[in-house]
Curated annotation (Swiss-Prot):
Biological process per Gene Ontology, one example term: DNA repair
Organism encoding this protein: Streptococcus thermophilus (strain ATCC BAA-250 / LMG 18311)
EC number per UniProt: 3.1.21.10
Protein name in the entry: Holliday junction resolvase RecU
Annotated Gene3D superfamilies: 3.40.1350.10
Amino acid sequence: MVNYPHQISRKIAQVRTKKSNRVDFANRGMNFESAINATNDYYLSRGLAVIHKKPTPVQIVKVDYPKRSRAKIVEAYFRQASTTDYSGVYKGYYIDFEAKETRQKTSMPMKNFHAHQIKHMSQVINQDGICFVLLHFSTLKETYLLPAKDLIAFYQIDKGTKSMPLDYIKKRGYAIAESAYPQVPYLEIIEKLLGGNT
C-alpha cells in the first residue's frame, strides 16, 4: 500500500487512538494549581501579598547518568510528610492553605486530607494565622474557600473517612468567582474576613 503524505495508514491511526484513550492521573489538579500559582504571581507583582508554593522535601537515592549532561533521577523518596501547599504573608498576617480538586459533583473526598495536615492547620490557627483550603470542583467549575476550622470540625467527626458534602462547603465556605486576573481571587474573601473592603 502506498501512503501519500496526506494519508495516514490504518496501523498508525489505531496506535494513536489507543494512546489518546489512556487516562493520565499524574497531573490531576495541575490546572487548578497553575491557576493558583498565576494568582499568587499576580498578587506578588502588584505588591499585595507574598505567597508561594511550598517545595515538597524529597530525598534523592539513585541517579542514572546515561550521558554526562543528562542526569536522570531513578529513585527518590519523600523525606517527611508535607504540611500544606502554600504559605506567605498578606498585610502582616501569616497565610497558610491547602488546595484540592475533585471531579465529583456532590462532595470532596476527605481521603485527600491527612492527619498531619489537619494537625498543622490546627497549629496555624492556634498561632492566629489565617488558614483555609481552596476546594475546586472541576466538573461544576466551582471553587470555594473553606476556613480551616470548618475543615477540622468535619474531619474530627470520623477522622477523614467520609466525603465532605458540597452543601456543607457552601454553608460554611465562600464561593470564589472565576476571573481573568487574578484567576482565583481568594484574597478578596480574606480581606472581607479581616473586616476590610475590597
